[in-house]
Regions:
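Basic, Lys/Arg-enriched alpha-helical interface segments
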Residues: 1-70, 79-83, 92-116
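Conserved catalytic cores of phosphodiester-cleaving nucleases, focusing on short active-site segments
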Residues: 86
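Residue-level signal for short, function-critical loop segments
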Residues: 89
Length: 116
């Protein structure tokens, strides 16, 4: 079985918007999100709904719900079992906002360009 490593995307200046997003969540949501990240690290590309869903062009969402609050963290798979978390948002609409998917794709392109 492949070993997976979960990595938070970092900008060139070292800032990690997705890490900042997760750390800013309320205590219960943050605890559940870290639990789901552990499951993602263990299961990797075999993780499916209700925890994970493929959105578009290799971008996936990790799905976290506490009460009526819904949070998503988008990610993609990279070489050698790396899972790169790109961005997170609080879900307020039925569909994932296209701008969040676009941001995930932009960060993926940036990551691949810088990491080779």
């Amino acid at each position: 079985m492949t070993e997976f490593t979960v990595i938070a995307y970092e900008k060139e200046d070292g800032e990690s918007p997705v890490e900042d997003f997760i750390n800013a969540l309320d205590v219960k949501m943050k605890a559940k999100m870290y639990g789901l990240l552990s499951i993602l690290q263990e299961k990797g590309n075999i993780l499916r709904e209700p925890y994970s869903k493929h959105l578009d062009d290799g971008i996936f969402e990790l799905r976290c719900k506490v009460g009526n609050n819904i949070t998503r963290v988008l990610y993609f798979f990279y070489y050698e079992g790396k899972i790169i978390l790109t961005n997170g948002f609080v879900k307020k609409t039925q569909k994932t906002p296209p701008e969040e998917i676009r941001l995930a794709k932009e960060r993926r392109a940036d990551y691949i360009e810088r990491m080779g």
